[in-house]
């Protein structure tokens, strides 16, 4: 019970904040929670994507093959897909500070162990089958730990921010994975270039420790635990009488509401439009994680040094921020709430960027252009195909079920991509004078084909609209 109680949501504090100080204290603590969640999750992503930076040097060292790296990478995504659902449910009833810090601590530890294993391996040579299995287990643990990051940060916004401004702060938080991915490519890429691939993991572990410290210092579980009233009362959204009346009404209507919710959720699973979008998102995730995971290796194959290659790929992450922000503006203002046309345009742009990246040669300008276009396109597609378009065609009460289906399919496809891409890359690898050369033609067909399918499938939903429930 002691372990479970450690993660239990904090109860109200006996020490109350004086009325005249409540507004000032509340605004300070809620902003700290937002900053801690955003920075903390950005550093989660550094611990998640470090392996993407070092695949080329690992292959050249002969420590692991592309097939083995693909299998290890897929373990993280499979575990993340399963853990995201489970930990999302657990986080709702947890102390979000401790929950989020615990996940990042474990993730930092797995990166440290991977790096130390690499340092030890320099005197051993190629990894044995047993060591590969152990690394798969280690990265599975990392995937599960990574799934403990998103929910606490989002729940923090829900517990501390009123509905009237929550969306604005959620928009800023949504850029955290782009920030983390960009930091990973720049920071870890520099360490790899200076000190070797093992130190890329060391850098990720250090970033994780920094994130844990920030979360523990600045994230707060809920207003009540700090001697404040609940957020609805603090912000004037509701009176105590309204809160009590709603609680009583919910208790009285719980049985019928539960039955209705189950029927609505069943209808989502029978909705072919949701599955078209889930598959579309899955194929988009194939292309997304292909470049995120193997893009540095592609550029190294063109002759770029690791540090330069990681800098170029990081541009994709930074531009993704603008793509995400742009997606909402475009659909709401320019297209009057229509997601399908901008998603189609972004899908075509995504394919064009992949073709330029894979077959545009070794010009820095051309590859930078490809990453700019891809970042903008992926930012839009993650927002639309990754969930919003599915939410648009189901009853409001079934939004969570639709998002769950899309998310699960997306990560299953992304995980499988890592395995298949690794096998195809190994098949395209030749050794000339002791140096490995990789032909990306076959795997490039896979990535481009997936991107094409991802923008064709949503066309089957062109005239579908949300059911007003």
Regions found by a protein language model. Name each.
Residues 93-104, 333-347:
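Cytoplasmic membrane-interface "Motif A"-like loop-to-helix N-cap segments
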Residues 51-55, 271-325, 382, 387, ...:
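Extracytoplasmic gate region of multi-pass secondary transporters
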Residues 138-179:
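Cytoplasmic helix-loop-helix junction between adjacent transmembrane helices
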Residues 173, 177-224:
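Helix-loop-helix hairpin linking two adjacent transmembrane segments in secondary transporters
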Residues 105-128, 348-362:
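C-terminal ends and interior cores of transmembrane alpha-helices
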Residues 49, 77-85, 181-182, 317-325, ...:
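Residue-level signature of mid-helix packing/kink "hotspots" within the transmembrane helices
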Residues 14-27, 226-276:
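Juxtamembrane intracellular "pre-TM" segments in multi-pass secondary transporters
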Residues 337-388:
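C-terminal transmembrane helical hairpin of 12-TM major facilitator-type secondary transporters
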């Amino acid at each position: 019970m002691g372990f479970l109680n450690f993660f239990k949501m904090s109860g109200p504090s006996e020490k109350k904040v004086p009325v005249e100080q409540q507004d000032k204290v509340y605004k300070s603590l809620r902003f700290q929670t937002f900053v801690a969640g955003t920075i903390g999750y950005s550093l989660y992503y550094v611990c998640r994507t470090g392996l993407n930076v070092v695949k080329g040097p690992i292959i050249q060292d002969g420590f692991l093959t592309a097939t083995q790296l693909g299998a290890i990478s897929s373990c993280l995504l499979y575990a993340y897909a399963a853990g995201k659902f489970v930990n999302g449910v657990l986080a709702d009833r947890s102390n979000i500070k401790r929950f989020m810090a615990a996940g990042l601590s474990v993730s930092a530890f797995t990166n440290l162990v991977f790096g130390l294993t690499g340092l030890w391996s320099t005197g051993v040579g190629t990894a044995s089958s047993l060591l590969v299995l152990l690394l798969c287990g280690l990265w599975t643990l990392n995937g599960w730990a990574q799934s403990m990051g998103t929910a606490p940060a989002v729940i923090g916004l829900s517990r501390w921010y009123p509905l009237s401004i929550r969306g604005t702060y959620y928009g800023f938080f949504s850029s955290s994975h782009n920030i983390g991915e960009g930091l990973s490519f720049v920071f870890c890429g520099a360490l790899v270039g200076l000190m070797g691939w093992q130190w890329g993991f060391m850098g990720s572990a250090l970033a994780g420790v920094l994130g844990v410290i920030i979360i523990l210092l600045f994230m707060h579980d809920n207003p009540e635990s700090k001697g404040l009233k609940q957020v609805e009362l603090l912000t004037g959204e509701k009176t105590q009488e309204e809160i009590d009346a709603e609680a009583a009404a919910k208790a009285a209507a719980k049985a019928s509401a539960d039955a209705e919710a189950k029927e609505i959720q069943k209808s989502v699973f029978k909705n072919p439009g949701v599955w078209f979008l889930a598959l579309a998102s899955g194929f988009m995730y194939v292309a997304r994680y292909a470049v995120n995971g193997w893009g540095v290796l592609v550029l190294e194959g063109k002759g770029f040094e690791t540090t330069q290659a990681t800098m170029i790929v990081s541009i994709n992450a930074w531009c993704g921020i603008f793509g995400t922000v742009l997606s909402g503006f475009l659909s709401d203002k320019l297209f009057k709430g229509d997601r399908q046309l901008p998603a189609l345009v972004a899908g075509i742009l995504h394919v064009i960027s992949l073709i330029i990246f894979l077959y545009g040669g070794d010009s820095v300008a051309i590859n930078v252009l490809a990453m700019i276009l891809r970042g903008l396109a992926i930012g839009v597609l993650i927002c639309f195909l990754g969930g919003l378009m599915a939410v648009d065609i189901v009853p409001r009460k079934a939004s969570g079920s639709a998002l769950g289906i899309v998310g699960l399919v997306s990560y299953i496809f992304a995980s499988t991509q890592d395995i298949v891409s690794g096998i195809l890359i190994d098949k395209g690898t030749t050794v000339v004078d002791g140096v490995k050369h990789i032909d990306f033609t076959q795997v490039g067909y896979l990535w481009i084909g997936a991107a094409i399918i991802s923008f064709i499938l949503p066309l089957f939903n062109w005239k579908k609209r949300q059911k007003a429930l």
